[in-house]
């Protein structure tokens, strides 16, 4: 369901010339990380050791014994072609050098797994909890919520931890930050303002343009965080987000056999029946004017303007004020606005 996975598949793996290079010099194995998370973990660790970062699509070149020698995420067709040729040539001309490097990477992976979980029960001391919080607070984005920088992930587990911490230690300033984070995410393009549910992350630092893939595990965890926040704050926005997100999961991810689908694709078909990133979630002004009776009010509420603009005349809906604030400003009741 990842956009860049589709791009690399179309550009490289479905390209005859690239396929010939791969088939002539390599045995190609495609791993479903949902089915084999253990295999995914090994090669993700390897790529992180080699490059300092990871992600998907995850591409790894390994020796016949499975030891990784090269890896990365997305590569253009030209980059991937050169990588394949260079690695193949190096292995033919200097296999010992490649094998030595593979051994070092493998040892690095093994070293990273030397730390084992403590299975003995332990009681955390307040000092330990406070120290953990102090490490994370330096990265808090007090303007846009979430954590500093981009891309911006919701990080539901961290928000849940901070929510518990502020409740037990009575930290009003931290609670203010948490509420800002939850509100900004709910107002942002990372949240589907029409259909409910959260995308995986935003590519900018203000939660506007999402990576349009929607993950089951993200939405499940965010439902939990917003529910707990509502218990503490009784903010109707949080309650609405929980209801809308659960409705999205039930409508779009329910497999009707007792299970749920793990994700929704970032790409959907456009008017030419071609897959395009985010086209299902983005709008032109012309489309909205044809659909919305009171377009001007709608456009003001969802910032169909320079604030909400993405690219190619497309807009990602984003809010910047509450229902109450907007209704009052436009001399409407909340029911009239809805």
Residue ranges, per PLM feature:
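Replace the tail clause
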Residues: 1-338
């Amino acid at each position: 369901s990842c956009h860049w996975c589709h791009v690399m598949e179309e550009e490289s793996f479905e390209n005859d010339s690239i396929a010939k290079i791969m088939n002539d010099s390599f045995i190609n194995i495609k791993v479903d990380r949902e089915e084999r998370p253990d295999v995914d973990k090994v090669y993700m660790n390897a790529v992180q050791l080699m490059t300092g970062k990871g992600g998907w699509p995850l591409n790894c070149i390994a020796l016949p014994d499975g030891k990784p020698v090269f890896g990365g995420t997305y590569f253009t067709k030209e980059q991937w072609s050169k990588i394949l040729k260079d690695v193949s040539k190096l292995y033919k001309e200097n296999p010992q050098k490649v094998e030595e490097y593979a051994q070092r990477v493998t040892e690095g992976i093994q070293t990273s797994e030397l730390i084992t979980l403590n299975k003995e029960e332990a009681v955390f001391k307040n000092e330990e909890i406070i120290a953990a919080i102090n490490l994370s607070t330096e990265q808090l984005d007090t303007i846009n919520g979430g954590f500093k920088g981009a891309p911006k992930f919701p990080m539901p587990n961290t928000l849940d931890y901070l929510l518990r911490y502020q409740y037990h230690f009575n930290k009003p300033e931290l609670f203010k930050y948490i509420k800002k984070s939850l509100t900004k995410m709910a107002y942002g393009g990372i949240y589907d303002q029409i259909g409910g549910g959260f995308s995986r992350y935003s590519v900018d630092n203000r939660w506007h343009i999402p990576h349009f893939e929607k993950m089951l595990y993200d939405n499940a965890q965010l439902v939990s965080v917003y529910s707990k926040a509502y218990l503490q704050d009784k903010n109707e926005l949080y309650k609405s987000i929980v209801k809308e997100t659960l409705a999205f999961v039930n409508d779009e991810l329910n497999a009707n056999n007792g299970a749920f689908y793990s994700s929704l694709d970032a790409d959907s078909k456009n008017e030419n029946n071609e897959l395009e990133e985010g086209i299902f979630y983005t709008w032109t002004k012309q489309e909205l004017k044809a659909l919305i009776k009171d377009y001007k009010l709608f456009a003001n509420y969802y910032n169909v303007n320079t604030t909400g603009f993405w690219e190619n005349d497309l807009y990602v809906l984003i809010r910047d004020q509450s229902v109450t604030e907007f209704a009052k400003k436009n001399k409407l009741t909340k029911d009239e606005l809805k």
